[in-house]
Amino acid sequence: GILLTTQLYRKPTLWAKRSMKIYMVFLNGWISIVYYMMYCGARGHHHILAIFWGVIAVLWLWDLFTGYTPFERNPKYKVLVGVLYAMPFLYPLLSWARGMEFPMMTTTVMPCSVAVFTIGLLLAFSRRVNLLVILFLCHWALIAFSKVYIYKIPEDLLLASATVPAIYLFFKNYFEQNLHKETKLGARLMNWFLILICIVVGVLLSMTL
């Protein structure tokens, strides 16, 4: 992940962009199949979480073939992007500071770490992004607020707090780019579709609490 991200910054070739998308398909697929279906099989509603991350993997697979996300650099949010990039490494440090050890501690390839890294990556290259991926990940981040109190996981407060401004910036960019299209039927239908997706994902994730 670090090597591919560095390659996107230094030499954003077509190969580098496709490799990052393949990596995202693998990473989200691993969370869906290995982490939730196998490792967390005893947890209630684990199948919903597996489907959730499986859908994100499919969205990246679709992006791989269509080239929808061009990974074009947007340098406006360097500070926030840097914070989001650091989060996956702060997660295990905070778990370790609380006296936890593997497998109880949060690692860099667990769902919350992957979510915050992906949000940071897409914010850094936010000229045009797959908004469905953003919606899914932002729902996950907001659910993290409740996990802080329900499951006593203070690490998730990092994810939730850092992604709130990212959510605002993503949708600010989206509406700025599409403001001139608001009278077109296609744009309005897409807005309603995104709202519907938000509601459905929110309901499904709330069932896992």
Kindly give the residue locations of the regions a language model identified:
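Membrane-interfacial loop-to-transmembrane alpha-helix junctions, especially the N-terminal start
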Residues: P12-V25, R73-V81, S126-L137
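Aromatic-anchored segments of alpha-helical transmembrane domains
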Residues: F26-V34, L84-S95, L137-Y149, V201-S206
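Loop-to-transmembrane alpha-helix initiation sites
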Residues: H45-A50, Y149-P165
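Alpha-helical membrane segments in multi-pass integral membrane proteins
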Residues: Y85-P88, E101-S146, L158-V164
